[in-house]
């Protein structure tokens, strides 16, 4: 049930505080909510399910890009051993300085030369979405359907709202009382073995999400 959570501090000695102002070393955490959940076990509709990301490091390259490096394991609830794999994901930053990680790990096709331009027309379509909400136990979070329409309509299962693309690879989703800040970029879909539009972001209550485009609107 490993996962990666984030707190921040102005001092390396702490205290490290999460999105809601809670100390990461607080004695009580009955609902498993302390720490901004950056990554947990996950499964897209196609491909391998993964669990237990952890033992991470953060890298910062000469081009100013940030990366999360961690171990992770393929889903295995048997008594047989399962070796760890390594994933590297780019880190993006919210307007107020909180990190959220890319929806897919880096692939051999990622050159590191920069993010390709993306238009609003390219973004519209059907998606799979994973919402990284804290849970007890954390377990494996599965993807659900999502839609971004040309007129700004947003749909995620029964949730309806609006979305907008503000260019410079940034966008916004709003529904109910929530606003989600998102980054938009082209990347490799590890499950479908193709390049696609990927989204990642952070909700106004500190819940991160991933999404990947899987098809055109009818």
Named regions from a protein language model:
Residues 1-218:
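Carbohydrate-active catalytic/glycan-binding domains of CAZyme proteins
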């Amino acid at each position: 049930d490993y996962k990666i959570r984030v707190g921040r501090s102005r001092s390396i000695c702490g205290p490290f505080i999460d999105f809601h102002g809670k100390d990461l070393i607080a004695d009580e955490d009955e609902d498993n909510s302390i720490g901004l959940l950056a990554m947990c076990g996950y499964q897209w509709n196609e491909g391998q399910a993964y669990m237990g990301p952890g033992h991470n490091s953060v890298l910062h390259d000469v081009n100013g890009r940030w990366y999360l490096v961690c171990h992770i394991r393929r889903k295995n609830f048997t008594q047989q051993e399962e070796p760890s794999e390594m994933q590297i994901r780019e880190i993006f930053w919210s307007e107020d300085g909180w990190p959220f990680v890319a929806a897919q790990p880096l692939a051999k096709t990622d050159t590191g030369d920069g993010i390709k331009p993306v238009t609003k027309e390219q973004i519209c379509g059907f998606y799979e979405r994973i919402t990284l909400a804290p849970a007890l136990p954390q377990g494996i979070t599965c993807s659900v359907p999502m839609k971004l329409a040309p007129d700004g309509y947003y749909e995620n299962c029964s949730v309806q709202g609006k979305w907008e693309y503000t260019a410079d690879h940034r966008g916004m989703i709003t529904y109910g009382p929530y606003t989600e800040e998102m980054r938009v970029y082209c990347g490799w879909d590890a499950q479908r073995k193709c390049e696609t539009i990927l989204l990642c972001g952070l909700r106004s209550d500190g819940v991160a999400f991933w999404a990947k485009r899987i098809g055109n609107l009818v």
